[in-house]
Design a protein with these regions (language model features):
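A conserved FAD-binding loop/helix module that cradles the flavin
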Residues: 209, 289-341, 412, 416-434
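Glycine-rich dinucleotide-binding loop and its adjacent helix/turn
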Residues: 44, 134-188, 192, 262-264, ...
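Short glycine/serine/threonine-rich phosphate/pyrophosphate-binding segments
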Residues: 12-16, 38, 150, 175-178, ...
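FAD-site-proximal beta/loop scaffold in flavoenzymes
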Residues: 147-163, 241-312
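Flexible, glycine-rich terminal cap/loop adjacent to redox cofactors
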Residues: 2, 7-33, 45, 49-56, ...
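Glycine-rich flavin
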Residues: 2, 18-25, 30-162, 190, ...
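Short hydrophobic core segments
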Residues: 5-7, 110, 125-135, 168-169, ...
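Beta1/beta-strand and adjacent pyrophosphate-binding region of the FAD-binding site
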Residues: 1-12, 162-172
Length: 434
């Protein structure tokens, strides 16, 4: 008998497995696709690899203004091969860790027979606990027209060649990333969002800033717009367009079998499986983590949920805390947000940061929010925003006062100095802005 059977080896499942196994638990992981889940195989890793390559192309194209002349030619077959090699290397790393910790990996599709029995490849696995970590899948687009043109945020990585033009449907974080990356790699891009601004659910000023930068890069951004695909025609509002590919980026949905859950008596809704703060379902020995739990579709949240579930299975009381979840969007420039965007706020422009000027990219800003002398939230738009947000996340988590960060000496010249200057601005003591 296993102590735990985990279904799914994505960032939730594999982290949970390792957290359990290193404490001596007998763990079996069932995975029907590749190790690392959507994040490694079809999400975070391949998109960020392409984002890095797009950044190289962008810098090479802008190098002439710095006195560096170069001709840019993209061989997508090589780029794609290197991307897949990176994915394979990281997935292999997870497999290596499984062997190191004695975690049994079974390839196949799991069928949950009871809360103590899982069937895989006609073999029954008996277990004390079950962890569901089956992730999510892209939402489909309600159209039967032009199937040869439509790709999802998963299937786009299977394309052998870069399309000349792409219509991206959905201006959330995934749609904005793909629009930016594909544009950087030379594709003509239309980006359509039904809501008033890009990145719906986030402060409008952020979506507006990204829209401005995208338009400057030549992307056709259409917020508060509708799309219709019918009779072999693609209409944005009343305008007909003819993209080579149509990328559907309208979100994801939990990947579970509702009939199976109902038979087991596990509570769920359209957002995901219902869990408590310990990641338990209504069946005390069945846990749900990652996208399937429906809280956040973020790999770093999934991994943390995996650790929390593991600790509770091991008898160490642990609860999820979602108050300081960083949210990053890998556009050009990047966006990073953490905490509450409310209270007294001040903004510091990246153009006043020395390192941003050295990098040749001064777009964006750092905006900080405080209440009763405690840092509440931070918004960063700019080069390497995803790297800077970690310090803000820690400061908010520890309930630090702005002066606690200000009185910490920061290296110069660095981008995090912009965070310090923004904090100084809260009481009018900024050094590098008026």
């Amino acid at each position: 008998m296993y102590d735990v059977v985990i279904i799914g080896a994505g960032p939730a499942g594999y982290v949970c497995a390792i957290s359990l196994a290193r404490q001596g638990a007998k763990v079996c992981v069932v995975e029907k696709n590749g190790l690392g889940g959507t994040c490694t195989q079809k999400g975070c890793i391949p998109t960020k690899y392409l984002h890095s390559m797009g950044n190289i192309v962008r810098k090479a194209k802008s190098a002439k203004k710095f006195g560096i002349n170069s001709n840019i030619e993209i061989d997508y077959s090589i780029l794609s091969s290197k991307m897949k090699s990176t994915v394979s290397k990281l997935a292999s790393g997870i497999g290596f860790l499984f062997k190191e910790y004695g975690i049994e990996l079974v390839n196949g599709e799991a069928i949950i027979k009871s809360q103590n029995h899982v069937i895989v490849n006609d073999k029954t696995l008996e277990t004390k606990n079950i962890v569901l970590a089956t992730g999510s899948k892209p939402k489909s687009f309600p159209s039967e027209s032009l199937p040869e043109k439509i790709v999802s945020t998963d299937s786009i990585f299977d394309l052998e060649d870069l399309p000349e033009s792409v219509l991206v449907v959905g201006g959330g974080y995934s749609g904005c990333e793909f629009a930016s990356i594909l544009n950087a790699l030379g594709c003509k891009i239309w980006l359509v969002e039904m809501e008033d601004s890009l990145l719906p659910g986030q402060p409008k000023e952020i979506g507006d800033a990204i829209e401005k930068y995208m338009k400057l890069d030549g992307i056709s951004v259409m917020a508060k717009s509708s799309i219709k695909i019918d009779n072999e025609k693609v209409m944005i509002n009343e305008e007909e367009v003819n993209p080579e590919k149509i990328l559907i980026s309208t979100g994801r949905k939990p990947n579970f079998n509702t009939d199976e859950l109902d038979k087991l008596g596990i509570a769920w809704n359209d957002d995901g499986i219902k869990v408590n703060e310990c990641m338990q379902t209504n069946l005390s020995n069945v846990y749900a983590i990652g996208d399937i739990a429906g809280k956040y579709e973020l790999a770093h949240v999934a991994s943390y949920q995996g650790e929390v579930a593991a600790q509770n299975i091991l008898g160490e009381k642990s609860a999820m805390d979602y108050s300081t979840v960083p949210f990053c969007v890998f556009t050009y420039p990047e966006v990073a947000i953490v905490g509450k965007c409310e209270g007294n706020s001040k903004e510091f422009p990246m153009i006043a940061n020395a390192k941003a000027n050295c990098l040749g990219d001064t777009r964006g800003f750092v905006k900080v929010f405080e209440e009763n002398g405690i840092l509440q939230g931070t918004v960063i738009v700019g080069e390497h925003a995803s790297e800077i947000i970690g310090e803000a996340t820690l400061a908010i988590k520890l309930k630090l006062k702005p002066k606690d960060v200000i009185e910490t000496i920061h290296a110069h010249p660095t981008l995090p100095e912009a965070f310090v200057d923004a904090l100084r601005s809260l009481d009018g003591k900024s050094i590098h802005s008026s």
